[in-house]
Design a protein with these regions (language model features):
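Active-site neighborhoods and metal-handling regions in enzymes and metal-associated proteins
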Residues: 1-186
C-alpha cells in the first residue's frame, strides 16, 4: 500500500496536475491509478462509519474549507452537502496550491498520504517567500514528530512537544483547525 502511494502521489501525480483539470477529475484519476496498481479501493480508519474511497483534491483556498472529516485539509467539494472528492467545476489555474489527500489499501492494510504541490512558477508568485516559509516549517514539524516516534512514547506527549515548536502565524489553517498531527489510518 505504501509503495503504491509513493508511486502514485510522488511520481505520477505531477503528470496529472495540468491547467484546467478539475479537483474531482484529478482525485478520480489518481484513485484509478492506485486501483491499477493493486489498491483494494477502500480505506478504513478508527471512526464510526470510518471508510473513505477516493479521498480529495483541492486547489487554492478550497483546501482550507473545513469538513466533518478530521483531515489536515478540506475541500469545498461540489456543494456544502458533498464535501469530498473535490469540485467538478473548480479548475486548476497557475499560482495555486494543489492539496491531495487520497487513501490507499492493499489486502486490508491501509496507508494515508497527503501531499501538496504548487502549480506554476513559484518564483513569480508574489507570496513565494510565505509559501516557502510555511513549507519549511511543515517539514521541520514533520521531522521533529518522526524523531519523537519511539517505542513507549505517549502520543499526547509527542503532540505537546511538537506544538511547543509550532509557529502561531499558521494556526488558522493548520490541520484544518484540528488538534492532531495525524489520524488513524495505517
Amino acid at each position: 500500500s505504501g509503495s503504491i502511494h509513493r508511486n502514485v502521489l510522488d511520481e505520477l501525480a505531477p503528470r496529472f496536475i495540468v491547467q484546467g483539470v478539475s479537483e474531482a477529475e484529478l482525485a478520480v484519476n489518481l484513485y484509478a491509478e492506485m486501483l491499477r496498481r493493486g489498491s483494494h479501493g477502500v480505506a478504513r480508519f478508527n471512526l464510526p462509519l470510518g471508510e473513505d474511497v477516493v479521498g480529495l483534491a483541492s486547489f487554492g483556498k478550497s483546501g482550507l474549507v473545513k469538513t466533518a472529516f478530521d483531515g489536515p485539509g478540506g475541500t469545498g467539494g461540489t456543494c456544502v452537502a458533498v464535501q469530498s472528492i473535490g469540485s467538478a467545476f473548480r479548475k486548476l489555474q497557475a499560482g495555486r496550491l494543489v492539496y491531495l489527500d487520497i487513501p490507499c489499501g492493499v489486502d486490508g492494510y491501509h496507508t494515508d498520504k497527503t501531499v501538496v504541490y504548487y502549480y506554476g512558477d513559484l518564483d513569480q508568485d508574489p507570496f513565494s517567500d510565505k509559501i516557502r516559509s510555511a513549507y519549511e516549517h511543515c517539514v521541520f514539524l514533520e521531522e521533529l514528530t518522526a524523531s519523537l516516534l519511539q517505542p513507549g512514547m505517549v502520543i499526547e506527549n509527542i503532540y505537546r512537544q511538537v506544538m511547543e515548536q509550532f509557529d502561531p502565524q499558521y494556526e488558522n489553517g493548520f490541520m484544518n483547525g484540528g488538534k492532531f498531527l495525524g489520524h488513524s489510518i495505517g
